[in-house]
Amino acid sequence: PATDTAIRKMIKETDGDHFEDMRSLDQELTFCETKKEFQKRNITLEQPQMKTLGIINQDGIYTNLALLLSDQCVHTIKTAVFEGKNQNIFKDRKEFTGSLFAQMEAVYDYIDFRNQTHSTFEKLYRIDNRDYPEVAVREALLNCLVHRDYGYSSSILISMYEDRLEFTSIGGLVTGVTLEDVMMGISVCRNKKLANVFYRLELIEAYGTGIQKIMNAYQDQFIKPEIKVSNNVFKIILPNTNAQAELREELQYHTHIQPEDEETQIMQMIDQEKRIQRKQVQERLGISQTTSGRILKQMVKKGLIMQRGRGKNTCYVKK
């Protein structure tokens, strides 16, 4: 037998109704945040424009699209930061409310604040890398806002782990569209009028480009973004680029496929400097703090070098 969700979906498809076109149950709506967003682009948002966009219907009644853009929007985004790679320990959690535009700005800032920057060194030059490419975060967030099924009350869920960032929204793919279609750039928009508003505000460039931008942001990375789809859920998983860089170094080290022998280079450094610190190894070899520390510890265990001092004063000398 069909589930309640499946029956509801079939009825919607048969009747041809769209959530954003239906009358909003709340007609006492204000649009402070949305008007600010329009003002940023020097676009007028008065009653004629509201009718054109579908915020007000032909009878002068606010639609559900109006509800989504209003300060009274009932749909929310829930975020959580977890310790490690599972959901056992919460580090932080927060729920964002208000207009979709208010949520968009606040959630992006929330993620951006926690999107750490790690530095590596290539010869004399420092290279800064954020955990998650900003364009990928932006497009994943916009995808959730524009494409989710607002006919359901479930919140968008954004979960940050040690090694990944997940965006989960209610509403699978539109009927007739496959995941393969999406990966090839095909997009059938569930909320056409909402997408049109975002398009007019230059938040999205064209329908169907978002997923490709996410993939392009990781084109030089070891692990790629992952998209999971069920009948009712769409999930985008962004790998932590700095976490995977350390994983890549681990794999290279243990399989001995490095272009140069780190231990030999470190011994040469000690011959020249007499004593060295971990940071010097990190900068000279262009590896992470974790990897440089591990190599030095292994060299101590092998009896190649000795460790002297503690904390910031720790240094390594030839045995």
Mark where each language-model region is:
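Key DNA-contact positions within bacterial/archaeal DNA-binding proteins
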Residues: T290
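Short acidic, hydrophobic short linear motifs in intrinsically disordered regions
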Residues: Q272-R284
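A short, conserved structural fragment
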Residues: V300-R308
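Active-site helix-to-loop segments that bind/position phosphate- or nucleotide-bearing substrates
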Residues: P1-S154, M160-E162, T168-V188, G210, ...
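Short, cationic-aromatic polyanion-contact patches
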Residues: E260, Q277, R310-K319
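Glycine-rich/acidic phosphate-handling loop/turn and adjacent ATP-lid/helix
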Residues: L165-R200, Q244-P259
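Short, hydrophobic-biased segments on the C-terminal half of alpha helices
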Residues: L296-K297
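Conserved alpha/beta core segments of nucleic-acid transaction machinery
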Residues: N231-Q268
